[in-house]
């Protein structure tokens, strides 16, 4: 079909051709099937087939090329042998000669291309400077408009990658994304103005409106989210994920921020990691911090080397070298509370100026404000401590009610649980010194050791239930399981299993000494007794100033049998004692003060002379 002056004028055997317009398909001889609509469209084609040209001079110079489509004034104007091209729009692909497999849609799209292949340009002026580059995709007005030889580029959006000339392997999706990039390679921008100022920088990713918008020559920056890394113009190797993450950073290097507003105010701080909404959001120059959780380290500006994990942990401080892990751990810590470590829910929550504290466990050292050099390990250990310092609580509830007391050590479940102001105590074992409140300088080692002691001072109890009933007396020492268990008096010394145990609860004897298993174990009262040896003085209940020396001394197995009461007695050995040795003789004094029932001697000298001594 031919309509127009010289349309299909030279055709010989070409079939299924359509020519509409003056000189349309004028030189065609055997080419088939072609469609040409417009003045001079496909006018030079001879044997090329399956071409479609619509518009003045469209595909005008094509001779033997196949499968081309040109719609628009001068579209594919200079193409000669290039195949499988699509050009839609005035001047689209108008400089192409032998290039193949290109698609250009829009005025002047790919208008400078000569030999480049497999390019796609959709939008006016898109890829309009491209000459020999291959494998590029540009969608949007002016996208990749300056590219000449850069390859493997993807630009979607008005002016996307508009300044790119020779750079390769960039992806820009969004109006003005990567629009200043000239030679920078291997960048990805997704969102309005993402990586918009980058010129020669490489290996960066910006996803979101204005993401990494100010960067120019930097490397390895990643910004994902609205305004993420917005102002970064010199720092490198930063990662920002979230709305306004690292928004004000400019010069910081090696930072990672994931979460809304985290590290928002950072300027030159380096090597920080922030995960969670507003984590480290006011940090400016602080470096080497780790903050994980909503509002974690949110008050820090210049402090460095902090590790914070948990919602609002270390929320108020601008300080360094601090560890807070757990919800609101070190929540109120201020700028002078330094070198603290808090691990656990609300651990050291209210600390303000206290320094060099260690808290591990839920609510450990929770109420501490100014106390320093404390160590708390275990649920609620040292929970109520406020100003006390140099305390160590290890175990569930250990020293949990301590407030202002210092220099205490409690190890074990409920050890020194009730202590408030008692100082310089040591308790090791479950319930050891658990009821102590104000007593000081006590040492309790063993389950229930000094368990009932409240205000007593200077006591030592070592062994299960040793001195367990002692409450307010002091200066007592008990070593051995259940040694002094029922004793409530002071200044006693008990060494050995059940030594000084007492017949029943409430034994109030004082200043007694018992050494040996079961020694003085049946007493209820009595003072200044000394029992040394297994079972020595075992049966005495209320006597005072007695001395029992040797195994079973004073029992039914001893001389004169069991002694239950009495004062000022001395028992040496037991019924099996064979000999008693002493290097010198005993000195027995005769003193009127030690005698009773004294009467006059009236017998006279004759009676004395008559005596016959044997």
Each model region followed by its residue ranges:
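Intramolecular chaperone/auto-protease modules of tailspike-like proteins
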Residues: 195, 450, 590-614
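Glycine- and small/polar-enriched repetitive beta-structure motifs of secreted/surface proteins
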Residues: 1-591
């Amino acid at each position: 079909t031919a309509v127009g002056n010289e349309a299909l004028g030279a055709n010989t055997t070409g079939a299924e051709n359509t020519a509409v317009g003056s000189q349309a398909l004028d030189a065609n001889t055997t080419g088939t099937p072609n469609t040409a609509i417009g003045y001079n469209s496909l006018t030079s084609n001879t044997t090329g087939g399956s071409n479609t040209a619509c518009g003045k001079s469209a595909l005008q110079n094509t001779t033997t090329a196949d499968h081309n489509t040109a719609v628009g004034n001068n579209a594919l104007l200079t193409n000669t042998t290039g195949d499988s091209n699509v050009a839609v729009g005035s001047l689209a692909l108008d400089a192409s000669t032998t290039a193949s497999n290109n698609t250009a849609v829009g005025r002047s799209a790919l208008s400078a291309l000569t030999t480049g292949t497999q390019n796609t340009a959709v939008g006016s002026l898109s890829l309009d400077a491209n000459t020999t580059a291959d494998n590029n995709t540009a969608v949007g007005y002016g996208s990749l408009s300056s590219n000449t030889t850069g390859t493997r580029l993807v630009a979607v959006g008005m002016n996307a990658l508009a300044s790119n000339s020779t750079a390769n392997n960039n992806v820009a999706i969004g109006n003005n994304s990567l629009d200043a990039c000239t030679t920078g390679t291997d960048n990805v921008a997704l969102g309005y103005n993402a990586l918009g100022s980058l010129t020669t920088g490489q290996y960066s990713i910006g996803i979101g409106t204005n993401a990494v918008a100010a960067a120019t020559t930097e490397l390895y920056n990643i910004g994902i989210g609205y305004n993420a890394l917005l102002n970064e113009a010199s720092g490198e190797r930063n990662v920002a994920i979230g709305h306004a993450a690292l928004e004000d950073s400019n010069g910081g290097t090696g930072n990672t921020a994931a979460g809304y507003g985290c590290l928002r105010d950072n300027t030159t701080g380096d090597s920080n990691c922030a995960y969670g909404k507003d984590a480290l959001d006011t940090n400016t120059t602080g470096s080497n911090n780790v903050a994980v959780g909503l509002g974690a380290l949110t008050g820090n500006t210049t402090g460095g080397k902090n590790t914070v994990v948990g919602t609002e942990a270390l929320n108020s401080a601008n300080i360094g070298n601090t560890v807070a892990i757990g919800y609101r751990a070190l929540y109120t810590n201020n700028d002078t509370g330094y070198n603290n470590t808090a691990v656990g829910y609300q651990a050291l929550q209210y600390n303000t100026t206290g320094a060099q504290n260690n808290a591990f466990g839920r609510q450990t050292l929770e109420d501490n404000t100014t106390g320093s050099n404390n160590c708390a390990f275990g649920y609620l250990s040292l929970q109520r401590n406020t100003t006390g310092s140099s305390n160590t609580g290890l175990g569930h509830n250990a020293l949990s009610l301590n407030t202002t007391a210092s220099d205490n050590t409690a190890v074990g479940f409920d050890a020194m649980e009730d202590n408030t102001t008692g100082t310089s105590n040591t308790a090791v074992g479950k319930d050891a010194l658990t009821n102590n409140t104000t007593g000081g300088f006590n040492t309790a080692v063993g389950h229930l050791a000094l368990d009932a002691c409240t205000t007593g001072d200077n006591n030592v109890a070592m062994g299960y239930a040793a001195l367990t009933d002692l409450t307010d007396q002091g200066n007592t020492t008990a070593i051995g399981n259940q040694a002094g268990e029922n004793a409530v008096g002071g200044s006693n010394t008990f060494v050995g299993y059940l030594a000084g145990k007492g017949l029943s609860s409430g034994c109030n004897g004082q200043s007694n000494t018992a050494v040996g298993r079961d020694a003085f174990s049946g007493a209820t009262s009595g003072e200044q007794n000394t029992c040394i040896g297994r079972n020595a003085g075992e049966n005495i209940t209320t006597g005072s100033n007695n001395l029992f020396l040797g195994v079973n001394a004073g029992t039914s197995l001893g001389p004169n049998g069991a002694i239950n009461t009495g004062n000022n007695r001395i028992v040496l050995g037991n019924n099996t004692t064979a000999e008693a040795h002493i290097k010198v003789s005993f000195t027995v004094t005769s003193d009127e003060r030690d005698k009773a029932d004294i009467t006059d001697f009236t017998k006279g000298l004759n009676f004395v002379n008559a005596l016959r001594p044997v």
